Structure formats: C-alpha cells, structure tokens
A protein has these predicted regions:
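Hydrophobic beta-strand anchors of alpha/beta hydrolase catalytic cores
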Residues: 55-56, 87
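Coiled-coil termination/hinge junctions
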Residues: 8-30
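Short, small/polar residue-rich loop motifs at catalytic or cofactor-binding pockets
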Residues: 28, 52, 131-133
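A short beta-strand-turn-helix
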Residues: 33-54
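Structural microenvironment flanking redox-active thiols in thiol-disulfide oxidoreductases
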Residues: 68-106, 117-126
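Thiol/disulfide oxidoreductase modules built on the thioredoxin-like
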Residues: 108, 117-164
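Short, small-residue-biased leader/transition segments that mark boundaries at the very start
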Residues: 2-7
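Conserved redox-active cysteine motifs that mediate thiol-disulfide chemistry
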Residues: 52, 58-75
Length: 168
C-alpha cells in the first residue's frame, strides 16, 4: 500500500540518519555562531576545551520532553561540574520572548544560547543531524565529538553512565 511505502521510506531515512549520527563520534565538532540572552554573538568554539567535557543541550521552550529533563540535568550539573563537566543550552526557539521566559522559569546555571535566524538553525541542525529534540552533542577537551544524538536521559541515568566513563 501507499502508506506502507511512505513508512518504509521514512524508516530507511531514519536508519540512515542514525547510522550517520553514530559515525559523528570521533569527528571534530563544527563551529556555529549563536546569540546570548543579551544578544551577544557567541561561537561554539568559545566553550570547547574549557572543561573535560562539554554537553550541548539542544532544546526549545515548546518541547515538553526537553522541559521535563531540565531538573535532572541541573542535578547532573551539580554532581559533575567539579569533575570537568560544563553545559551550554542551545534553543531552537523562533520566539525570543518565549525562550527568555522559559530560561527565567527553569533557572539553569549555565550559559543559554539561541540560533538567531532560521538559516543558522537549519545549518546547525543539518551539521549535527538533529532530527528532533531534546538532542545532545558531547564534545571533549580536544574538540572531538564523543556523542551526538537523542538526549541521553539524565532521568534514567544514561547521561551519568557516559560521564562516569569519560570523566574518570
């Protein structure tokens, strides 16, 4: 049937994306420019190499699963920041206002960035094969990607497992 053909094509595309994502581990990160809450331009490379591991948390104010994960991510940050972890959140929100409201509400103690144009968002999501959010990119001190894909769930201990392995 036509529906099953569409499903098969979609499934094949998803599989290809998953394969490419798994191949991203070991690659050098790709730099992108974002904006801060105060509208300053900041590059991803400004954050890479400052700590043993940088978690880039990709989210948006309208994303339910993203918001549900934030309290767990805050706990992970508290537990690991002295062991070499830093976090930066990148929002793909269209609305500056909604983004800032969400940032105020969740009080994340790390830097908040946003893709400041549709082109930047598309380029960032394309370079990192972001098909949905929450998405996570984890970069080591040398700028090598150690993980890229669906957010490792702090709520389920997935993120902690990777951090325990990499921050020995």
């Amino acid at each position: 049937s036509a529906a099953s053909d569409v499903y098969k094509r979609q499934h094949k595309r998803d599989q290809e994306r998953m394969n490419k994502l798994s191949q991203m581990s070991g690659e050098t990160f790709k730099n992108h420019i974002f904006e801060t809450l105060s509208k300053k331009r900041k590059e991803l490379r400004n954050y890479v190499g400052k700590s043993k591991l940088l978690v880039v948390d990709v989210w948006a104010s309208w994303c339910g699963p993203c918001k549900k994960e934030i309290p767990h991510l805050k706990k992970v940050y508290d537990d690991y920041k002295d062991k070499g972890l830093s976090i930066v959140s990148v929002s793909i929100d269209d609305s500056d206002k909604k983004w800032k409201e969400a940032v105020d509400k969740f009080e994340m103690p790390w830097e908040q960035l946003r893709t400041s144009s549709n082109e930047e968002m598309k380029s960032f999501m394309g370079d990192y094969l972001i098909g949905g959010i929450p998405h996570m990119i984890i970069i080591d001190k040398e700028g090598i990607i150690v993980y890229a894909g669906s957010a490792l769930r702090a709520e389920k201990g997935q993120l902690q497992n990777l951090l325990n392995e990499k921050l020995k």
